[in-house]
């Protein structure tokens, strides 16, 4: 509901929210006209560079990049490119502090903890030691950033980011 109310018309949405975004296309069906670029395979880490490409290809249109924390780390340097090229990209990083999509894939092939994946293997899917701070990472590359923990805070942060052109990052802490 937050995106439907706030997404600017003609936004290009780049969606790599693998475990938290399954219903987003349907949820934004009533939003102003926009385009949706989404993950079509199993690879992760594509959303940040794809958002850069979308912003360069259509500089008159805002870009909303929906990314997860684990995937973002594959191509985090794209934030620097966003600043360097003065691209109008709002990046929302869903921070669930884990490679949840990889946990799901382990379950799909029957390799859960009880059936084979040991504690060491499962610990490799955890992103809390150390916990990544995307607000500081973004700031270090020159991207204005905020951290949010509620839907209301997310709405406020989206209003802030959409109000001015240029790159912005919102780290959304997921339960």
Regions inferred by a protein language model and the residue ranges of each:
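Short acidic, glycine/serine/threonine-rich loops at helix termini
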Residues: 23-29, 49, 76-79, 101-106
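Short gly/pro/ser/thr-enriched loop/turn and capping motifs at secondary-structure boundaries
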Residues: 21-22, 43-45, 72-73, 97-101
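Structural detector of well-ordered beta-strand residues that form the stable sheet scaffold
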Residues: 13-14, 37, 64, 90, ...
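A short, small-residue-rich loop immediately preceding and capping a beta-strand
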Residues: 60-74, 89-94
